[in-house]
A protein has these predicted regions:
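Active-site beta3 strand of CheY-like receiver
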Residues: 46-52
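Short hydrophobic/Thr-rich beta-strand motif most characteristic of the beta2 strand and flanking loop
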Residues: 27-35, 42
Length: 121
């Protein structure tokens, strides 16, 4: 059976490490990047099963990246889970409007993150 890949996109290396720590013993192949400008390259190279995408990042925020991925014919079927401290109802609504498949609010527990990833990967 092919190992499921999770692409983690967060400008904070510490946050990427935290997420990797939560998922490393769950059988997923983990790919972490800190630059939202490299998302398309990482997807093309890795073909992830699911993307965990931070919202608050420099240059391109997660809402923008999500919208661009969902409008791209080659990438729109890949589930995107937004991972963010933005936790208002309007933030969640805006994420859905951009095409996000899931939403995890920081701080999150290991179980919350696993539940979201398992739903799609």
């Amino acid at each position: 059976m092919l190992q499921k890949k999770v692409l983690i996109v967060d400008d904070s290396p510490a946050q990427v490490k935290l997420i990797e720590g939560f998922l490393e013993h769950e059988g997923y192949r983990l790919v972490g990047i800190n630059d939202p400008e490299r998302v398309e390259e990482a997807i093309a190279n890795e073909r992830p099963s699911v993307i965990l995408l931070d919202v608050v990042m420099p240059k391109r925020n997660g809402f923008q990246v999500c919208r661009e991925l969902k409008n791209h014919a080659d990438y729109n079927a890949i589930p995107v889970i937004l991972v963010t401290s933005k936790n208002t109802e309007s933030d969640r609504f805006w994420g859905q409007q951009q095409g996000a498949d899931g939403y995890v609010t920081k701080p999150f527990t290991r179980e919350e993150l696993l539940r979201a990833v398992r739903r799609f990967a």
